Amino acid sequence: MENRWQVLIVWQVDRMKIRTWNSLVKHHMYVSRRASGWYYRHHYESRHPKISSEVHIPLGEARLVIITYWGLQTGERDWHLGHGVSIEWRLRRYSTRVDPGLADQLIHMHYFDCFADSAIRKAILGHRVSSRCDYQAGHNKVGSLQYLALTALIKPKKIKPPLPSVKKLVEDRWNKPQKTRDRRGNHTMNGH
C-alpha cells in the first residue's frame, strides 16, 4: 500500500509558546473562570499521535477548535522543531480553517466585554460610560476617532495573566529581520 498524504494548514510555532498558551487557557478556565465553557483536551484523549492538545471554544452553535501538534516535519530553519497550531471553525458537519486574527475576533465577540456602539454615543452625549474592552487582541484594525477617544478616556485594566490570544500564539518572532549595528552605531552591510 502506498503512502497517502493529508495536507493541513498549520502554523509553525515554538514549543514554549504552546506551553504558555496551554497554561493561560487552563488558568482562565479553572482559576479566573473568564473562559467558562471552554474545553481542554489532552494528548492522551486524542487518537491521533501528532496532536498534543486541543482547545474547544463554543461560539453559539459553532465552535472554534485550536489544535496543537508535535512531531511534524521540521521547517526550513533550525528552530522549526516540528511544533504547530491549526485553527478550525466547526458548525455541525462543516469545518473550515481560519486565520489567527479572525479567531481572536470570534473569541472577542462571544466572551469578553468590549465597548458597544452605544457607548460611543453615550460618551459624546455626556452620559456615564462604564464598559471597557477586556480583550484587546480581538481588535485587528484602528478604530474610529470616537473609539480612540473613548479608549483614551477609559483605560483598559491590565489582566494578569493576560487572556489567551491565538494571534499571539502563532506570531513569528524568529523570522523578523534583526537590526544590527557596528561598533560606531552605523548599520552594517549584513543587517536590515
Swiss-Prot record:
Localisation per UniProt entry: Host cytoplasm; Host cell membrane; Virion
Any one annotated GO CC term: virion component
Record-marked site positions (Cleavage in virion (by viral protease)): L150, T151
Modification Phosphoserine, positions: S144, S165
Ranges for region Multimerization: 151-164
Region (Membrane association): 171-172
Name under which the protein is recorded: Virion infectivity factor
Gene: vif
